[in-house]
Each structure stands twice: as structure tokens, then as C-alpha cells.
């Protein structure tokens, strides 16, 4: 399915030749001119048996590079607040947390918050606003 959707590009990470991780780069809809500069990194996942080998970082950087090459200036993503390793990775790669959704997901009958992140991809990034 995902390979047939032109707005989505699938990335996979392999460990010992076996697909162990994946992520998707999603373009905004063509009719959304105001957000044509930004793309979304979504459905990033590393199999439990393959964690700790740098696949998440490799995939994230590959998606960033593809987004940059496609002309996007901003990459957005979201993650459950319980995904500590992913959150730490995104911070280390320069992503900025800009919002929290308190009812992002339901896991085992309980709400889990979601964190929203964004990163400017162009080297001539606009300076951050100061209060």
C-alpha cells in the first residue's frame, strides 16, 4: 500500500540483511500551498531485536537528506511521550519540541501524551525568536 501512495516515500533499515526498521517521508497535499515547505517524518519503527545498532539515527538522517534534496525546509514529526530513546535521539539531532497532545494515543486503556517536534533543514535557518 504505502509504495503506491505518491506523497509517501518508504525507507528501510537492514540488520544482517534483514529489514529491521522503517520510516516514511510524507509530503503535504498539493493543494496546501501554505505548508508546501514542510514534510513529515512518520511511522518510524525499529524492531525490538534490532535496537541499539543505530538504525533509528540512520533512518532519521536518510529521511532528512531526502526531504532536503526534495526542497523541503522543515521536517515535522510526533512521538509518544513514552518513547524516551526516540525523544533523546530527536533532541540530539536538533529537533525542537513545540507542542504536546495530552490524548495522543490509547495504550492498555490509558491515554498517552504525544510530543510534536520540528527541525529547520536549510543551513541558512531563520534565527529563533526571542521574547
Give the predicted meaning of each segment.
Residues 60, 67-78:
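Conserved GNAT acetyl-CoA-binding A-motif
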Residues 54:
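Conserved G/P- and acidic residue-centered "switch" motifs that form tight phosphate/ATP-binding loops
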Amino acid at each position: 500500500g504505502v509504495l503506491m501512495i505518491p506523497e509517501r516515500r518508504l525507507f528501510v533499515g537492514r540488520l544482517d540483511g534483514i529489514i529491521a526498521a522503517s520510516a516514511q517521508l510524507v509530503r503535504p497535499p498539493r493543494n496546501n500551498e501554505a505548508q508546501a515547505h514542510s514534510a513529515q517524518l512518520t511511522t518510524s519503527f525499529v524492531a525490538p531485536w534490532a535496537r541499539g545498532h543505530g538504525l533509528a539515527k540512520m533512518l532519521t538522517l536518510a529521511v532528512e537528506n531526502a526531504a532536503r534534496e526534495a526542497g523541503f525546509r522543515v521536517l515535522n514529526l510526533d512521538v509518544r511521550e513514552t518513547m524516551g530513546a526516540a525523544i533523546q535521539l530527536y533532541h540530539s539531532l536538533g529537533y525542537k519540541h513545540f507542542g504536546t497532545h495530552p490524548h495522543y494515543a490509547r495504550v492498555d486503556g490509558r491515554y498517552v501524551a504525544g510530543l510534536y517536534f520540528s527541525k529547520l533543514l536549510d543551513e541558512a535557518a531563520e534565527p529563533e525568536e526571542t521574547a
